[in-house]
Amino acid sequence: NIAATLVLLPFGKVLVKLATLTIPETEDEKVEEIPDATKLLDTRFLEKPAFAVAQCKNVGIEMAKLAQRSLEYAIDSITDYDQKKVKDVFRLEDMIDHYEDELGTYLMKLSGKPLSDEDNHTVSNLFHCMGDFERISDHALNLAETAMEMQAKEETFSEKAKGELVTYGEAVKEIMDLSVEAYKS
């Protein structure tokens, strides 16, 4: 077994490609790949605090976008249940938790470095916003869990209630869009 593994080791990527061609994924099995922006947080950048702060801001923006997407999927699933979107909310929550851990740790290291007043303000702002994005993701998860529970119990809203939920949902999405745009600038 060891010899066979060693012989086939260089062909790993080719074998994976062959396997996926032989047994393709169905649409339900396909999972959207989410790049991990926390890879931008290299400890070597801590020697250049201004650059490290810029990288943190970029990761914060990606975290905001993930929270926004999670909230949109959750809101949509309340009135029009979609198992794929609900699963994505759970995945996004895990990813956002990962971002919070990585970014929080990096910001703690960065806050011990000599920072300009502007960079110090940015780091402080990132700490606050990071918690807000994580909280938004938690609320999205709660909505997704409610949607799952309603689906399992075969409960639905009246047409009037659905209409009101769609109106409120669109308003929340617009507020989130404006918030993410404001955070970016």
Task: Report each predicted region and the residues it spans.
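Cytosolic, long alpha-helical scaffolding segments
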Residues: 2-185
